[in-house]
Amino acid sequence: MCGIVGFVGARADMQEILQGMMDAIAHRGPDGQGQFIEGQAALGQRRLSIIDLEGGKQPMFNEDQNLAVIFNGEIYNFQELTAELMRAGHTFATRSDTEVLLHGYEQWGKEMLQKLRGMFTFAIWDRKNETLFCARDHFGIKPFYYYQNDAGELLFGSEIKSFLAHPGFKKELNEEQLPLYLSYQYSPGEDTFFKGVKKLMPAHWLEWKAGQLTVQRYWQPKFDPDDSRTLEEWEDEISAAMKESVQAHKIADVEVGSFLSSGVDSSYMAALAHVDKTFTVGFANKQYDETDYAQEFSKHIGVKNYAYRITPEEYWANLGKIQYHMDEPLADAASVALYFVNREASKQVKVCLSGEGADEFFGGYNIYKEPFTVTWYDKIPLPIRRAIGAVADLLPPVHGINFLVRRGKPLAERYIGNTNLMDEHRKKKLLKNYHPGKLPTDLSRPYFELSKGQDAVTQMETCDLNLWMVGDILLKADKMSMANSLELRVPFLDRKVFELASHIPTKCKVNANQTKIAMRGAAEKTIPAKTADKKKLGFPVPVRAWLRDEQYAGIVRKAFNTPAAEQFFRTKELNAMLDQHISGKRDNWRQIWCIFMFLVWYDEYFVKR
């Protein structure tokens, strides 16, 4: 695990520029650094040593020194691929997974990507042909950004902040991303909040040659339900697949720990992993605290649990630092709790296992129950439901109103992913300049087309796998772990596990009363039934309550009345939204937090820097 940076474009001070970019991501790799500069190419890497502690240094070269690679991540089938490549005549100088990329690219070219099992971004510079080849893993576990300026220079790296050290980077806000963010609570799609900066999307490669940039998808995850097996058979297959995946994800030359919340995902993983240490965070308020459960469960499986309770003061004091590490604004309040659990874990281990991906693969979100509730309402003709929904949208928010509004639209219109904080009408009221380049449905539509003809839950899962998981779940997992120089591994997000999960029918995933049906059944083979059936809190955070406390609401109010807030928002509307929440008239906490996090992020990148 590490961080990578680089650029293509000859300059007199390339070494100094590259070092500045590397320094910006030093937190990703405190164990060492490496550089390669030749002609117009500059590659840099910061290393967190996990496998082959002495021999895995980067940049790494092939036998004839023609290819140079920098790599962020882990290839879990590297031993199998090493053996295959050695049989084909390749000679290995190390026992690291990095070297597999060099020989694999020599042997198979771009087709190598179909063989890799792991989390990765990498860049290979072909010295002979002066070509740059980069790729991102199948699910987008590791981040990769790129930027091409008017002079044709290409900048790339694990974090956008590294670009600030390059004189060819022009820092400009992409204000068109703001309306999308206000719906999603994260920055969705390939565009970012920085003009010209793009994300290399999951399962895509990028190639640069003679100033020309080509970006292409190499793999597409797709659900293909199979009704031929029983629930018990699916449970057995999940159990076997997860045991194998967890063991593959434990390969390391350093100690591995595991995160532990009160939910089935992390409990199941901790029990399968047989690690010595688990890590949990919570709050003094018992409603938002999982530490007692974690310590009890850790005793049950015979491991030591390290629990930490976050105070409100330190939660709020670290918001700026956290938004800085995110690179783009993220309004997921759990990201702060994730920062602290990574911080505490990094004091004990270098690698932690975590449960990301289980909800998207196995049907874990409560909203997936929606198609099974009040099904009679869907039998009412759509034009009538639309009319009822339009009227309901004008009424005060009381129990049941949101249901009428949502069910007044077809699924592809109402479901843009796991979050939908604000509709276009509300955004128009709040924003001074409402000029969206894209609407949320423009981003979700391709995934409904991909899953066309499938049931509603499968369509929702497809949407979340490609939007919510990449834009929120995996963003915060990577940025919060790397901010603390900790490698986070996600055994659920494995190609072999997905190959299985993609065929599990919805009836074995979700019904009106339960989520992750088959996965919970598989977990019961390893952990107590009461744990397997437990509802996940998911790093719960008491932000709703804090925003009704003047001590913390006052911090938000101050931000809502800054010049930055005036620049983008109608501050009268912002203050009214906050007043409604404080008084209890409306529950606006998620919308308030979304705007507040944007302002905190903007302050970090466009006011302070």
Residue ranges and their predicted role:
Residues 1-4, 165, 196-202, 212, ...:
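Adenosyl-5′-phosphate
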Residues 16, 173, 233, 237, ...:
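Generic recognition of stable, solvent-exposed alpha-helical segments in well-folded globular domains
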Residues 84, 166, 361-364, 500:
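Residues that scaffold the ATP/ADP-binding catalytic core of kinase and kinase-like folds
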Residues 160, 374-375, 520-521:
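Acceptor-binding helix/loop patch of EC 2.4 sugar-transfer enzymes
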Residues 320-324, 346, 368-370, 546-548:
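Short low-complexity, flexible loop/linker segments enriched in glycine and/or proline
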Residues 330-332:
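Acceptor-substrate binding/catalytic loop of class I
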